[in-house]
Amino acid sequence: MESPVRLSLLYVVLASLLLPGRSVFINRERANNVLQRIRRANSFFEEIKKGNLERECVEEICSFEEAREVFEDNEKTTEFWNKYEDGDQCESSPCQNQGECRDGLGSYTCTCTEGFEGKNCELFVRKLCSLDNGDCDQFCREEQNSVVCSCAKGYFLGNDGKSCLSTAPFPCGKTNKGRAKRSVALNTSNSEPDPEDLMPDADILYPTESPSELLNLNKTEPEANSDDVIRIVGGQECKRGECPWQALLFSDEETDGFCGGTILNEFYILTAAHCLHQAKRFKVRVGDLNTEQEDGGEMVHEVDMIIKHNKFQRDTYDFDIAMLRLKTPITFRENVAPACLPQKDWAEATLMTQKTGIVSGFGRTHEKGRQSKVLKMMEVPYVDRNTCRLSTSFSITQNMFCAGYDAKQEDACQGDSGGPHVTRFKDTYFVTGIVSWGEGCARKGKYGIYTKVTAFLKWIDRSMKARVGPTSETPRLTHPPY
């Protein structure tokens, strides 16, 4: 009896739905009362199935935990959830200047490219010296949150306030290989001077050995074998114009030269103080590429004045620096030009944080070998100060730095002492060191030790200003105070 009644009621409902003007659709609540279904997420079988994004979060509204079951990764889940919960905040591409947008809940984050900052990377970052050297060609310093560029002596600042230009035919710090003309500048930096006694004793010292070896203390002769290491020997030949600042100190007895030097301007040569103990009288040759051949580019200059640092220590090689004033000025040309002197702060922050510097000279090709007849150059990496200190039992003072290879058989050797260590920055070479000493030549685990030029820039400058007036007949040894 009950069944026919239910059927009758169903017919009435259906008939009423089909009457004209009545909708064939009913709302969700009424429909659920008519056709009920079990939601899959609540069933036992659904819970044990692996998460499915479409089933969990598209067909149904899901929770963060359900989305996490699908991605099984917090970062990916968060990235999806931020968009799922309130839409993609990055859809409008709010980040400017190629910034990368990351969506968040009700917000977004921009990761800006170098040189931009701000919420939307809309702000241009001021380029200070730590970023691309402030776009300066040479020296850079910061002043009132802005960059001030300047140039080495012999250059002037361009109209852009960044570039360094020169009208000199051979400016300092420029290699002249393949160039018809280049220029030089009387390069100076910050430095100081003073005088001292006549040249001390004329003991013959052996450059680039350790201080104690020079004094015959704990002297050990290296074993001669076929594996003798090669240093600037292991380097490459300097072609014409590649090492124009190289000078060679030689005596009548040592025509091949006993030490090197760096041309700073037409009158001054930078060298090592310990070189002054190897000959009572010597001359300076510039423009030489091969000591056995003359090509017309060599020039010999007599020394008018010798300026040695009065704190030079012969037992430790601390303050190993000296200046030579020439009687006649150097004529600069393709193969003869000075290296630039840097500014102290800029050099220590920028130059000496470069990966490598360059040394050159006529030094021995092996630890116990002969002097090289040709001028050689070699790129040597700067060595961390702590690493260098741990490599030797000798003192590495604040006036020294280390460069070279731990195992590679290349180094500076005897005869290279006093020679240039220069560092390149934007095609300009600046003096950064003086070849001073080392334990043997290119021994494994040992590095070359160099006088740190930035520690003496004021001394150098004042030394070059110390002597005014006509030259004297005999060389004089003066001594600027530090």
UniProtKB/Swiss-Prot annotation:
Gene3D superfamilies per UniProt: Coagulation Factor IX (4.10.740.10), Laminin (2.10.25.10), Trypsin-like serine proteases (2.40.10.10)
Main localisation: secreted
SMART domains: EGF, EGF_CA, GLA, Tryp_SPc
Residue span(s) of domain Gla: 41-85
Tissues with expression: Plasma; synthesized in the liver.
Annotated disulfide bonds: C57-C62, C90-C101, C95-C110, C112-C121, C129-C140, C136-C149, C151-C164, C172-C340, C238-C243, C259-C275, C388-C402, C413-C441
EGF-like domain boundaries: 86-122, 125-165
Gene Ontology terms: cellular component: extracellular space
Activity regulation, short description: Inhibited by SERPINA5.
Glycosylation, residue list: N187, N218
Transmembrane intervals: none
Keywords, sorted A to Z: Blood coagulation, Calcium, Cleavage on pair of basic residues, Disulfide bond, EGF-like domain, Gamma-carboxyglutamic acid, Glycoprotein, Hemostasis, Hydrolase, Hydroxylation, Protease, Repeat, Secreted, Serine protease, Signal, Zymogen
Residues of the active site: H274 (charge relay system), D320 (charge relay system), S417 (charge relay system)
Name of this protein: Coagulation factor X
Keyword DNA repair in annotation: no
UniProt signal peptide: 1-20
Reaction equations catalysed: Selective cleavage of Arg-|-Thr and then Arg-|-Ile bonds in prothrombin to form thrombin
Family: Belongs to the peptidase S1 family.
Function: Factor Xa is a vitamin K-dependent glycoprotein that converts prothrombin to thrombin in the presence of factor Va, calcium and phospholipid during blood clotting. Factor Xa activates pro-inflammatory signaling pathways in a protease-activated receptor (PAR)-dependent manner.
Organism of origin: Rattus norvegicus
PROSITE patterns: ASX_HYDROXYL, EGF_1, EGF_2, EGF_3, EGF_CA, GLA_1, GLA_2, TRYPSIN_DOM
Molecular function per GO: calcium ion binding; phospholipid binding; serine-type endopeptidase activity
Compartment(s): Secreted
GO terms classed as biological process: blood coagulation; positive regulation of TOR signaling; proteolysis
Peptidase S1 domain mapped to chain residues: 232-465
